Amino acid sequence: MRLVVCLVFLASFALVCQGYSSGYTRPLPKPSRPIFIRPIGCDVCYGIPSSTARLCCFRYGDCCHRG
């Protein structure tokens, strides 16, 4: 009995990992825009040089206001 429960659990876990759910499968949607990994300086704007803030604003659309 334990073996059956273990096998069912492993099979369901494998299906979830592959992206299947409740018998109906569909492709995962792609993001509408590319995902960029931002440098830490863009998120923490305090104490960064103004050239770095300008670069962040130009490249990632993340305008930093120094303060």
From Swiss-Prot:
Domain of life: Eukaryota
InterPro entries, A to Z: Penaeidin (IPR009226)
Signal sequence interval, chain numbering: 1-19
Cysteine disulfide links: 42-56, 45-63, 57-64
Modified residue annotations for Arginine amide: 66
Keyword Signal: yes
Biological process terms in GO annotation: defense response to bacterium; defense response to fungus; killing of cells of another organism
Assigned keywords, A-Z: Amidation, Antibiotic, Antimicrobial, Chitin-binding, Disulfide bond, Fungicide, Signal
Subcellular location(s) per record: Cytoplasmic granule
An example molecular function term from Gene Ontology annotations: chitin binding
GO cellular component, one term: cytoplasm
Record's function text: Antibacterial and antifungal activity. Presents chitin-binding activity.
Family of the protein in this entry: Belongs to the penaeidin family.
Protein name: Penaeidin-4c
Species assigned in the record: Penaeus vannamei
